[in-house]
From Swiss-Prot:
Ribonucleoprotein listed as a keyword: yes
Gene Ontology BP annotations: cytoplasmic translation
Family classification: Belongs to the universal ribosomal protein uL2 family.
Protein name as catalogued: Large ribosomal subunit protein uL2
Matching PANTHER family: LARGE RIBOSOMAL SUBUNIT PROTEIN UL2, RIBOSOMAL PROTEIN L2
A Pfam cross-reference name: Ribosomal_L2
GO molecular function, one term: structural constituent of ribosome
InterPro entries: NA-bd_OB-fold, Rib_uL2_dom2, Ribosomal_uL2, Ribosomal_uL2_arc_euk, Ribosomal_uL2_C, Ribosomal_uL2_dom3, Ribosomal_uL2_RNA-bd_dom, Translation_prot_SH3-like_sf
GO CC terms: cytosolic large ribosomal subunit
Segments for region (Disordered): 200-239
Biased composition (Basic residues): 222-239
Keywords (A to Z) from UniProt: Ribonucleoprotein, Ribosomal protein, RNA-binding, rRNA-binding
Subunit note: Part of the 50S ribosomal subunit. Forms a bridge to the 30S subunit in the 70S ribosome.
């Protein structure tokens, strides 16, 4: 009898494949929309923290109404600095406003997909989006991928660039460092290829380290066989 594939083990949901969210700092969401719809909420940065579950640092902010929230830290923010959230907040790094109030050409991040959802887009370390144009019923923003996306003018965004942009500049150099990067998020690492396994472990294993049969497989194949090009219309180079 063959062994379970990696995706079969992952689907079982054991702790080997489960995210260690108990080690994460917590959810990063904007304050509820009803608190800042008409007035500006001001808060002070209490501390800047490393979050194992993110590529960007997070800042803990204490607001004037006593509420504490985690925000994604922008480049250049300092402990003790004040930030503001609301439609009348000044145009300043770290402040959060509706896209309708942000000038064209501004760098923004942590953009809401729909008004009040707390922030969905552009949250990774070192990234930013560009406000390209504003119209009455939509705001066009260029995402880090280069895609031009339309947003509701009432969707909120934070001005600035996400901190942690230099994390990819230093080379990993050795496997030990890659191991700890994966371990922080409980990633399954290293992940061996099927052709390097024994035949008992994988349909592509055994023989002379090549698949030895077509790599295409039916959409209705059983879980232990469903590897390779699943229900592929075509394979190989386009000629």
């Amino acid at each position: 009898m063959g062994k379970s594939l990696i995706q079969q083990r992952r689907g079982k949901g054991t702790t080997t494949f489960r995210a260690p969210s108990h080690r994460y700092r917590g959810a990063v969401r904007y304050v509820p929309l009803n608190l800042t719809k008409e007035k500006t909420l001001v808060g002070k940065v209490v501390e800047i923290l490393h979050d194992p579950g993110r590529t960007a640092p997070v800042a803990r902010v204490k607001f004037e109404n006593g509420m504490e929230k985690l925000i994604i830290a922008p480049e250049g923010i300092l402990v003790g600095e004040e930030i503001a959230i609301g439609p009348n907040a000044p145009i300043k790094i770290g402040n959060t406003l509706p896209l309708a109030m942000i000038p064209e050409g501004s760098y923004v991040y942590d953009i809401e997909g729909t008004p009040g959802d707390g922030g969905k887009y552009v949250r990774a370390g070192g990234v930013y989006a560009l406000v390209v144009s504003r119209e009455k019923d939509k705001v066009i923003v260029q995402l880090p991928s280069g895609e031009l996306k339309q947003f509701n003018p009432m969707c909120r965004a934070t001005i600035g660039v996400v901190a942690g942009g230099g994390r990819l500049e230093k080379p990993i150099v050795k496997a030990g460092k890659a191991y700890y990067i994966a371990k922080a998020r409980n990633r399954f690492w290293p992940k061996p290829r099927g052709v390097k396994m024994n035949a008992v472990n994988h349909p592509h294993g055994g023989k002379e380290h090549h698949i030895g049969r077509p790599s295409t497989v039916s959409r209705r194949a059983p879980p232990g066989r469903k590897v390779g090009h699943i229900a592929a219309r075509r394979t190989g180079r386009r000629k």
